[in-house]
Amino acid sequence: WGVVGALIFTGFLLWRREAQRKPLATAALTGALFWAATAGTITLIEQQARGMPDVALHSLNGEAVHMDQLAPGQPLVVNLWATWCPPCIREMPVLEEAQHIYQDVAFVFANQREQPETIRSFLEENRLNLNNLYRDDQAQLARAVGSNGLPTTLFYNAQGQLIDSHMGELSRATLARGLEKIRGPDQ
């Protein structure tokens, strides 16, 4: 409300005092730009420092597992995907390979709203062997992290803080950059 009040007051002064219109307009514009930049930076920092959401995923057998139980004390890559999503399908071999190469990082595959039979058939047809495969039955994880599309890949550090995210198909280079951020440059 303070910003709205300041804008109304500035508008009143601009209307009443013709000689001060240009300096007041310049000051108001500068202040508004500074406020917008600061608010944007704070929002970005808050988003990047978010912890793991309090969401339960389900194994293909129906067992519930909370996000914070997936890889305590270990960097974590979470991939939100679906069998009907072409970019998800194209990136799966990259992620499957990475889960074997980067043993110090846990890779979790959170299928969005599909039945276990559909997921099993997809894995068999595509000859994929994915560890840590779960279902996000109600897309709670997607909502909690603000994902607006698939695939979405989340990169958490060993302390459970969201360090980076990527929406869209993941290339080897993009995956490597995300892994460097959560593992450290020397690993």
Identify the meaning behind each predicted range.
Residues 124-129, 136-186:
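Thiol/disulfide oxidoreductase modules built on the thioredoxin-like
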Residues 80-97:
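Conserved redox-active cysteine motifs that mediate thiol-disulfide chemistry
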Residues 1-54:
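N-terminal targeting signals for export/organelle localization
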Residues 100-138, 150:
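Conserved segment of the thioredoxin-like fold in thiol-based oxidoreductases
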Residues 54-76:
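A short beta-strand-turn-helix
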Residues 59, 80, 110-111, 133, ...:
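Small/polar loops that bind or transfer phosphate-bearing groups
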Residues 74-76, 81-84, 149:
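Short pre-active-site segment immediately N-terminal to redox-active cysteine/selenocysteine motifs
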Residues 77-78, 107, 153:
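Hydrophobic beta-strand anchors of alpha/beta hydrolase catalytic cores
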